[in-house]
A protein has these predicted regions:
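Conserved catalytic core of nucleotide polymerization and phosphodiester-bond processing enzymes
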Residues: 1-231
């Protein structure tokens, strides 16, 4: 089997994003469009045949970086990996962006400023551009955003109530101090000493990827879905 964009396929499958599953089937059959072209076309609501090489590159970063509930930070990481100049990108496409999503992104930026949160070194224009791309991708993927919410809710309730919870094909349950996620294959992902806090959210204990120390690690729906799709 062709394993191109395997994680994107798994996200679509767990989310039951039907239009995307159909697109993967058509592509594999040799009758469908390139998925990065299609990602851009769906987000910007333009004919897929009109997507240029540069626009495909935008679609590729959107597709690879936003599936796990990533936002501006994830897009910045992806852009760096593919040699994108986000300030130039903003200059090139800002005026073409849909005004509704631009206004939403502007309001989000004002909230970020008020909270003194991370802006990733971007100018206002570049931040709004990237956040708008995020919003366009999410609106084109309603089932995917739905599975993020379902996973978050199921994980939280499993910890709080200690009763099994389901999110699509996934089952969350507590076994002692461990949060277990039953995958569609029947295998389990396990998160030791899992707990939920109203302010911190979901956390568990594991080896931190940066410090290599055993410590408390915070997680959320997107990271849980990433673990699931990479298992």
């Amino acid at each position: 089997a062709d394993l191109a964009n395997i994680e994107g396929r798994k996200v679509a499958w767990y989310a039951n994003e039907e239009w995307k599953l159909d697109a993967f089937r058509d592509y594999d059959a040799g009758v469908g469009h390139d998925l990065y072209n299609l990602a851009y076309a769906r987000a910007f609501r333009v004919p897929v045949e009109s997507v240029t090489k540069d626009q495909r590159a935008i679609g590729k970063v959107m597709e690879l970086m936003l599936g796990y509930a990533g936002g501006v930070g994830a897009f910045v990481t992806g852009a760096a990996g593919y040699g994108f100049d986000l300030e130039k990108l903003a200059d090139d496409i800002y005026e073409t962006l849909p005004r509704v999503e631009v206004e939403e992104a502007y309001n989000f930026l004002e909230w970020i400023k008020d909270k003194k949160s991370q802006r990733y070194g971007l100018t206002d224009k570049a931040f709004i551009t990237v956040d708008t791309l995020k919003r366009l991708w999410r609106k084109a993927h309603p089932a995917t955003t739905g599975i993020w919410a379902a996973i978050q809710r199921a994980a939280e309730l499993a910890i709080i109530t200690r009763e099994p919870q389901e999110a699509g094909l996934l089952k969350f349950e507590m076994k002692g101090a461990w949060l277990r996620v039953r995958l569609a294959s029947g295998r389990y992902l396990c998160y030791p000493f899992a707990k939920y806090d109203n302010e911190k959210g979901i956390s568990y204990y594991g080896v931190d990827r940066y410090t290599r120390k055993w410590q408390e690690i915070r997680t959320y729906s997107g990271k849980l879905l990433e673990n699931i799709c990479q298992s």
